[in-house]
């Protein structure tokens, strides 16, 4: 009997089972213990293969692929700390709903807790963060192929959102020629190999029912809060709110067109807050809200009813409002709850939103990161997409810009970490094959610098704007101790990215004016390659501009 041959047949069943649950993208890191899984993936023509040498970046690459494809993405890594490096992407997927299937190779049980090399306790290492975990036994013909495939189907059928961790131990030898070992075991699945459906099919209903009193609530004074959603959902939500005559507060990830722009500015105005107090119902569609003033208002508001609609299960309201938590796809929910044409009930808020926008526009000529956020609409590629980093940049875009309705916007706003942002953006581009503009800060770029290797393979123009404000300037907005702010919070690195781009053979520009940025972008959008554009800005201007605008708008 050939152990290596049967390992590969066992792995072939695992990978084939994944195809029956919509998996098309497989992300693979190099490793020896994962050889059976890697070879099985390589031999399966249903897969598109992606490789990366860094498992942390690989997990985020898969996250980006899943964001766009809306299908589960598989990740294959070897044993040991390679597995632990998937933790950040797994956590993010659990909070934002992308579906990942983590296939982690492992040593067999007899090599755990005995000092064997590269052997750690992998089973259950991710605690409660995966939606499901499955620890497979060592491959053996004593266990039927039917057990293996039906066990996988049972776990994968429950993957509504988040990650599944499937731990796969393999004994040595891992290499060798294929022979007939396990052929009959594999063939016991019969014509399943020629089929395209799961061995075990399970139906699971998640959609919420129509709220029978909706006809009553839609006649009341309401507010619509739009969080993270798809581009198509964003357009539908905007039309729905407009028909109802309800003010729409749109997050940067809502893709609603933000008809009341600069919400995180005007929500700091007492007149706006007073008018919003008249709302009898708040309907929040989508989660992961960004703006500080929006979150403060959301926590303090006390409507008669607060409804949250999102396809992700679980609690999504840190303010714990009295109301309804409805699990549904946003587009489906809107169809079940049609709007009734009514006149807008808000008077002050549209005026304040326009005045806030004009206050921001009056500062647009200065070369800085706040102005970049305001101008970002002008730099979006036609028929393309935007990926927004975390920390200060996403807050500035949320507060100071107005993105087009239905324009795709992606970000990692679940755990909101600065790790893996470039890798995630690379996955977004690969899955969509669209022109992509990605914006991150300098520390975020340093954190994921080796992801520039992924940007050597793009299928459409990709522009990475690194806003270099020399450190974590988000902390300038917080009451951090002034005496220790630079040393322990901002941590300026005093670096530039020209040599990093050159190391990966990527085009690079460092514009010092809006005209130079326009020229760099015009050239970048003409070729299907990656261009790194570094905007070196004054350290504190972005944070200070936001604070000045908040003060100005609060007194309108």
Swiss-Prot record:
Pathway: Quinol/quinone metabolism; 1,4-dihydroxy-2-naphthoate biosynthesis; 1,4-dihydroxy-2-naphthoate from chorismate: step 2/7; Quinol/quinone metabolism; menaquinone biosynthesis. Binds 1 thiamine pyrophosphate per subunit. Pfam families: TPP_enzyme_C (PF02775), TPP_enzyme_M_2 (PF16582), TPP_enzyme_N (PF02776). The keyword Transferase applies. GO terms for molecular function: 2-succinyl-5-enolpyruvyl-6-hydroxy-3-cyclohexene-1-carboxylic-acid synthase activity; magnesium ion binding; manganese ion binding; thiamine pyrophosphate binding. Its cofactor is Mg(2+); Mn(2+); thiamine diphosphate. GO terms for biological process: menaquinone biosynthetic process. It comes from the Bacteria. Catalyzes the thiamine diphosphate-dependent decarboxylation of 2-oxoglutarate and the subsequent addition of the resulting succinic semialdehyde-thiamine pyrophosphate anion to isochorismate to yield 2-succinyl-5-enolpyruvyl-6-hydroxy-3-cyclohexene-1-carboxylate (SEPHCHC). Homodimer. This is 2-succinyl-5-enolpyruvyl-6-hydroxy-3-cyclohexene-1-carboxylate synthase.
